[in-house]
């Protein structure tokens, strides 16, 4: 029986787990927290698909074209085609396992418009689609747990891959309760560790997603891809702790963006520039337009009747009332762009295998399907679909040889123990917050050469000092040992952004304002002993 180690228990990790278990493989599903606390539960808007009986005259080909166009043609057509062709079956599967979709007046799954799409094709569960899918998949995981095919390991954090000569044989995980490292050997390891929110501090996402796994595997030889493409969601609301996402569903239901001019009159700037559908341009376009107004921007949905708002946007109503005392049935929502999604991550082939054999990546930590900008509604689809693709690929592989890494485990445990006996030079939180400030200031919606160089120099200072920074014993050891990997990833993101001398999708350069034909390829970056090597994937080495 094949053994599969999946690290991360959000939607992509659970999708891969139930698909592997369904094919008779034994799965260890490891994560720091239960699935109910994964970032996946925060996904509000919906999941894209073209169903056979749709009344929109929509087609799978239209979904493919919209996805490729929305990604500024950097996503691979073959992988996107597989994603879109499989979407209808995924909606049916999710219904079958208990996902409670909102229904239209004919009792069928309801769908609405989302940005950058030529037809209404985003199916939803109110404004809590992620929660519903997590709940349904969680029940499937429990079913396979009862059958002995899935074993959950909670309180486990990724430490490093067990990699030799470009092949992965397992991973070392850190136990939060034991403060010990443990080696897990497997025929395949699947990373489902999410995006890079900690790099930027206040984002719409969870700080569980810190990018460390990608940074550490990058240091261990994995190729990363498209790191410069960072999606700023155009409609987020400021709160004390973070930026709260105001779902694209609000604009899908007719929400209008505006600012006030000198006469205190509303200017519907998106409609003025792009016509009636202006509010539903792609996220990169809307964020850039908000940035260029230089004004306070508002999103208004108050013209809809209260019954419709309560039925279709209940979570948005409750969110605004709870955190800002705003009644969206009566007044507009103050919004601004904020870091939301990372199109870049571990480079994977169409079967989700990384540059390291037997190491796979799914969900937001994998760079596939979205190109230079993700369409709303495609991330949940990619999470469910990608987990299945990886499971299929793993099932076709022969069981690999076993190599033990006992000396490596012992050495890493000794390093951890010795570090715990030191006294902190700087508080972990101080360094983390400073890194986030550097990234926010130098990797905004619009970037320029000087700011990118400044950011690289500041991150380099911390990287060079990493060996002298002692552990902060006021936090979990995980936060201490993960810091160097996060710093290396931050430097790689800045390096890729400086390398791409054009404006495409979510990447905008002040000095290079147009799309350049010479950059019509994904960015690949490798790491070797402190050296960062960037190139364009002109040969279609990954995602075709």
Annotate each predicted stretch with a short phrase.
Residues 2-3, 34-36, 42-43, 47, ...:
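Glycine- and aromatic-enriched mobile tails/lids
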Residues 4-29:
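N-terminal Rossmann-like FAD-binding beta1-loop-alpha1 element of flavoenzymes
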Residues 33-66:
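Conserved N-terminal glycine-rich FAD pyrophosphate-binding loop of Rossmann-like flavoproteins
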Residues 73-77, 108-134, 197-201, 297-307:
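Helix-loop-beta segment of a Rossmann-like dinucleotide-binding subdomain
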Residues 75-85, 123-139, 203-211, 236-240, ...:
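Short beta-strand to alpha-helix junction loop
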Residues 95-180, 185, 192, 233-240:
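Conserved redox-cofactor binding core of oxidoreductases
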Residues 188-243, 377-393:
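Glycine-rich loop(s) and the adjacent beta-strand/alpha-helix scaffold that form part
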Residues 216, 222-329, 393-399:
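An anion/pyrophosphate-binding glycine-rich loop and adjacent beta-alpha core
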């Amino acid at each position: 029986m094949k053994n599969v180690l999946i690290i991360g228990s959000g939607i992509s990790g659970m999708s891969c787990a139930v698909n592997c278990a369904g094919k008779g493989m034994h799965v260890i599903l490891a994560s720091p927290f239960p699935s109910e606390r994964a970032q996946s539960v925060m996904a509000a808007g919906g999941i894209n698909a073209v169903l056979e009986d749709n009344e929109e005259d929509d087609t799978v080909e239209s979904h493919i074209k919209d996805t490729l166009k929305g990604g500024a043609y950097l996503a691979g057509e073959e992988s996107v085609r597989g994603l879109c062709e499989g979407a209808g079956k995924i909606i049916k599967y999710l219904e079958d396992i208990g996902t409670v979709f909102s229904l239209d007046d004919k009792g069928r799954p309801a769908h609405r418009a989302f940005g950058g799409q030529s037809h209404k094709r985003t199916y939803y569960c109110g404004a809590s689609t992620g929660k519903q899918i997590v709940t349904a998949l969680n029940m499937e995981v429990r079913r396979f747990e009862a059958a002995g095919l899935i074993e959950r390991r909670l309180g486990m954090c990724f430490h490093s891959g067990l990699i030799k000569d470009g092949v992965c044989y397992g991973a070392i995980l850190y136990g939060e309760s034991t403060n010990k490292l443990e080696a897990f050997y497997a025929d395949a390891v699947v990373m489902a560790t999410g995006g890079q929110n900690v790099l930027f501090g206040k984002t719409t996402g969870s700080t569980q997603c810190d990018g460390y796994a990608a940074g550490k595997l990058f240091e261990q030889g994995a190729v990363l891809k498209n790191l410069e493409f960072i999606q700023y969601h155009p409609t987020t609301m400021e709160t004390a702790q973070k930026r709260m996402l105001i779902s694209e569903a609000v604009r899908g239901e007719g929400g209008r963006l505006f600012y006030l001019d000198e006469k205190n009159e509303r200017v519907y700037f998106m409609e003025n520039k792009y016509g009636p559908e202006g509010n539903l341009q792609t996220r990169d376009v809307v964020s850039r337009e908000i940035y260029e107004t230089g004004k306070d921007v508002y999103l208004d949905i108050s013209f809809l009747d209260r019954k419709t708002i309560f039925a279709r946007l209940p979570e948005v109503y409750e969110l605004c009332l709870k955190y800002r005392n705003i009644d969206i049935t009566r007044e507009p929502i103050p919004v601004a762009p904020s870091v939301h999604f990372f199109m870049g991550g571990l480079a994977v082939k169409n079967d989700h295998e990384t540059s390291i054999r037997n190491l796979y990546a799914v969900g937001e930590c994998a760079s596939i399907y979205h190109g230079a900008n993700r369409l709303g509604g495609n991330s949940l689809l990619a999470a469910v679909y990608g987990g299945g693709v990886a499971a299929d690929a793993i099932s076709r592989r022969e069981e690999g040889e076993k190599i033990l890494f006992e000396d490596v485990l012992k050495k890493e445990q000794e390093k951890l123990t010795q570090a715990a006996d030191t006294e902190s030079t700087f508080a972990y939180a101080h360094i983390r917050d400073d890194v986030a400030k550097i990234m926010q200031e130098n990797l905004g919606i619009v970037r320029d050469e000087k700011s990118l160089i400044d950011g690289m120099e500041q991150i380099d200072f911390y990287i060079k000092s990493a060996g002298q920074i002692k552990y902060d014993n006021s936090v979990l050891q995980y936060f201490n040992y993960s810091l160097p990997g996060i710093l290396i990833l931050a430097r790689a993101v800045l390096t890729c952004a400086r390398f791409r001398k054009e404006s495409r999708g979510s990447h905008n350069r002040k000095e290079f304002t147009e799309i350049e034909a010479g950059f019509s390829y994904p960015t690949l970056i490798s790491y070797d002993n402190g050296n960062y090597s960037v190139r364009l994937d002109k040969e279609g080495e990954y995602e075709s």
